[in-house]
Amino acid sequence: MSHLLSKRASARQRLHFSVFNFDNAPEGFEPHPDPLWLDAGMPNAGFFPIDSLQINVVDYPFQKSLSLPLGNSSIENLNHKDTGVEESLKRLTTTGESKNHVMVTKRTNDPKLIDLSRGLQYSEVEGIPQLLEFTRNLIKRAHPPKYDDWTTIVSNGAGDGLNKAMDAFLDPGDVILVEEFTFTPVLLNIQNAGGIPVPIKLNLDATSGKSEGIDFEYLKNLLENWDELRPELEKKKPKALYTIASGQNPTGFTQSIEFRRKVYNLAEKYDFAIIEDDPYGYLTLPPFSDPDVIHKISDFLTIEDYLAHHLIPSYLTLDTSGRVVRIETFSKLFAPGLRLGFIVGHKDVIDVISKYSNIVTRSSSGTSQLIVNNVIEQSFGGVDGWLNWVLKMRFAYTKRRNVLLGGLFDSEAYKKGHLNVIDPRAGMFTSVIINFPEGTNVPEKMRLLSFKLRAVGVKVVAGLNMAVDKSFSEPRGNFFRLTYAIAGSDSELREGAKRFVSAVEEFFKKGLEF
């Protein structure tokens, strides 16, 4: 694995003046068991102006707007009767000591919690130990790697994690494969490391089961005939693949475990790393269903069923040589403003990332770490409590996805064949493909339609805005990315869908003119 690391990352050293060198100690030397600290430039916790924090935690997304009681209830202890979800939730009552109020004090004796004396202090570059332990336990539960020499490091969110992963693998001039439509800010991380992004064609067939994102045959052929197909790269082989394998941004496609296995086998054969960006993967989604159907408590999955049959295993679970690095974030499941995530990979990879972190970011925010860790451990109840929260998020996102897609599917624009809709199996995005007549100047008509959509009052993202190489992807750039995450209510989603399809319908009636 070490041969794939960048020369820049491999050459970094650790350096700190307070590290004592015990080499060549005089005979008979024994370190004092409890020395006094007169070396560290750290203020004593008594100087911190904050004595305690109280965090009030909800049981369910949108709990306040639904007027649900605070009960610290889990999905698995709800009464699974044939009752509508909202009605059942409103009947919940608090029993026993509430765990909806998390108190963070200056000091605690609970080894799983982070107190203010630790959270407000300088801390380890790798992350505060309690949160690090949670990240490792989560990976063991949800995506256990096949080898033992793996570990995690806390990051300042997925963007920071991606920047550090690119630095770990890419030297100037190194080639990295990227899905042709992607989270384009990552291109800046690649550029910062000096890498060369090469787009991989996606299969944008919206028919259910017809596509898993990456066009595998295209990828396979590209690798088999690399020198002939990419002569301008002067026989530089790909060093890595960057992929959003679940709920792909922007398309919404999700790769099955069988598909991932085929891609991983290519990585072994052609010796490249896989950088797996997974901000949305825990938000698995069932196929679209009527949004007006009253869902029952029994529709909730158990944690075991979710892990066994719904959560797609990470590339980590296939990795036998340490070539997979997984980027996780708390942004989509907790809160993005905390700027907190973590990276999973082989210890050699995490070591070079740790050395880079020591230069560019040092440790992540201690306040963010204590909020996330203590809410999960004290209110949710550890790893399974966190997964229980994920299932509640999943349920809410499923309903929202159904509301938005229902508005699209019921439209005249859809029934007339003006558009197709990708039904996502994970995440917070769907893509709507506009079916222009053959020979249409797609970029120009997408530009005009974008103005039409803004004029009717709906903001979406044009597919070509998320292309790695617009000239390469122009034939497949006839889509818009829509999200069901930011809207404040189901009525906003319905109105957004209504405005979108009305603009498309009018655009086609006017002969593809504004």
Task: Walk through the language-model features, giving the residues of each.
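N-terminal "arm"/small-domain region of PLP-dependent enzymes with the aminotransferase-like
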Residues: 2-127, 455
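Short, solvent-exposed loop/turn segments at secondary-structure junctions
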Residues: 41-45, 159-160, 182-184, 205, ...
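Conserved core of the PLP fold type I
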Residues: 65-271, 275, 281-318, 420, ...
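Conserved core segment of the aminotransferase class I/II
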Residues: 77-95, 103, 111, 134, ...
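Short, conserved charged micro-motifs
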Residues: 170, 438-448, 490-494
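Conserved glycine-rich beta-strand-loop-beta hairpin in the small C-terminal domain of fold type I
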Residues: 390-405, 409, 417-437
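PLP-dependent enzyme catalytic core of the Aspartate aminotransferase-like
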Residues: 456, 467-514
